[in-house]
């Protein structure tokens, strides 16, 4: 995830926590606040109960990657903090983790509802009309 899309300073995290709304799932807590910029920025926090440094870093990397894949579809103008609550994030199937994050983002109205168009597996762009039936 590029640096422009990340929260980095403690005061940025503090502002999101103080001004934002919170959405929870069994694995994650998402806190969302309107940004002072037009971009979308994300921060990732891992609870110590997840495990040692290696486990916490692995959990952070997995969640960061799942969010990175969704970035082009997210509504800009918000700062988000994902707090990883449990060690299950480390061993969970990646698709299940993505589904959990997608549900949280939809709950926060940052991810539009899916359309019925066929989507290319390589990118999120719809396939051209002539390729739809030949899959």
Swiss-Prot record:
**Which reaction(s) does its UniProt entry say it catalyses?**
Endonucleolytic cleavage of RNA, removing 5'-extranucleotides from tRNA precursor
User: What is the recorded name of this protein?
Assistant: Ribonuclease P protein component
Q: Which GO terms describe its cellular component?
A: ribonuclease P complex
Report residue spans for region: Disordered.
Answer: 115-135
Instruction: Give the family, as the similarity comment puts it.
Output: Belongs to the RnpA family.
- Alphabetized GO MF terms: 3'-tRNA processing endoribonuclease activity; ribonuclease P activity; tRNA binding
Q: Name one Pfam family in it.
A: Ribonuclease_P
Upper lineage is: Bacteria, Bacillati, Chloroflexota, Chloroflexia, Chloroflexales
Q: Name the GO terms of the biological process aspect.
A: tRNA 3'-end processing; tRNA 5'-leader removal
Q: What does this protein do?
A: RNaseP catalyzes the removal of the 5'-leader sequence from pre-tRNA to produce the mature 5'-terminus. It can also cleave other RNA substrates such as 4.5S RNA. The protein component plays an auxiliary but essential role in vivo by binding to the 5'-leader sequence and broadening the substrate specificity of the ribozyme.
Q: Which UniProt keywords apply?
A: Endonuclease, Hydrolase, Nuclease, RNA-binding, tRNA processing
Q: Which organism is it from?
A: Chloroflexus aurantiacus (strain ATCC 29366 / DSM 635 / J-10-fl)
The record's annotation in Gene3D superfamilies points to: 3.30.230.10
EC number(s) on file: 3.1.26.5
User: Which SUPFAM superfamilies does this entry report, sorted A to Z?
Assistant: Ribosomal protein S5 domain 2-like
């Amino acid at each position: 995830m590029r640096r422009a899309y990340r929260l980095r300073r403690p005061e940025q995290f503090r502002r999101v926590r103080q001004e934002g709304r919170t959405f929870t799932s069994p694995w994650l807590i998402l806190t969302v606040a309107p940004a002072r910029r037009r971009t979308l920025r994300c921060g990732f926090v891992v609870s110590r109960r997840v495990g040692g440094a290696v486990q916490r870093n692995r959990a952070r990397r997995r969640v960061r990657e799942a969010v990175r894949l969704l970035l082009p579809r997210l509504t800009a103008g918000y700062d988000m903090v994902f707090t990883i609550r449990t060690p299950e994030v480390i061993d969970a199937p990646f698709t299940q983790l993505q589904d959990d994050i997608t549900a949280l983002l939809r709950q926060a109205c940052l991810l539009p509802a899916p359309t019925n168009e066929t989507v290319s597996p390589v990118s999120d762009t719809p396939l051209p009309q002539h390729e739809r039936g030949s899959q």
